[in-house]
């Protein structure tokens, strides 16, 4: 397995798919990286030369990936919570942030139901 930007990428997959294993690199970014380096998307990682792998890692280092990107996202969320914006309050309460309804559903964000026992009549 080749190691690019601190991530072991799978050998037996196509290069364009393997690059998406890096946090912050999606399919369009992977395609543009390979296009600038004139590397075919259909080549498997195991067929890449050491020089090509080095060039890919240099090109990817120009992007924010992995820990740096995760840190930036968490700091952005923390900033929203500190300034007391609506989005920050939703993050703090553990509710959907982007305007989704939360009367029913929204279980992924809210977590499992907290059932309350019925009172006897």
From Swiss-Prot:
One of its GO terms (molecular function) is rRNA binding. One of its GO terms (biological process) is translation. Residues 110-121 have a biased composition (Basic residues). Pfam families: Ribosomal_S13 (PF00416). PROSITE patterns: RIBOSOMAL_S13_1, RIBOSOMAL_S13_2. Keywords: Ribonucleoprotein, Ribosomal protein, RNA-binding, rRNA-binding, tRNA-binding. Residues 92-121 are annotated as: Disordered. One of its GO terms (cellular component) is cytosol. Coiled coil: none annotated. HAMAP family: Ribosomal_uS13 (MF_01315). Belongs to the universal ribosomal protein uS13 family. Part of the 30S ribosomal subunit. Forms a loose heterodimer with protein S19. Forms two bridges to the 50S subunit in the 70S ribosome. Located at the top of the head of the 30S subunit, it contacts several helices of the 16S rRNA. In the 70S ribosome it contacts the 23S rRNA (bridge B1a) and protein L5 of the 50S subunit (bridge B1b), connecting the 2 subunits; these bridges are implicated in subunit movement. Contacts the tRNAs in the A and P-sites. This is Small ribosomal subunit protein uS13. It comes from Mycoplasma capricolum subsp. capricolum (strain California kid / ATCC 27343 / NCTC 10154). The gene is rpsM.
């Amino acid at each position: 397995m080749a190691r690019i930007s601190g991530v072991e990428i799978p050998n037996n997959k196509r290069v364009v798919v393997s690059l998406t294993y890096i946090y912050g690199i999606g399919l369009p970014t992977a395609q543009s990286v390979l296009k600038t380096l004139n590397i075919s998307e259909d080549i498997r990682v195991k067929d890449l030369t050491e020089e090509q792998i080095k060039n890919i890692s240099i090109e990817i280092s120009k992007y924010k990936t992995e820990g740096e990107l995760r840190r930036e996202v968490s700091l952005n969320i923390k900033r929203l919570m500190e300034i007391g914006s609506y989005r920050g309050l939703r993050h703090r309460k553990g509710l959907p942030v982007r305007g989704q309804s939360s009367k029913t559903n929204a279980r992924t964000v809210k977590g499992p139901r907290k059932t309350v026992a019925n009172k006897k009549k």
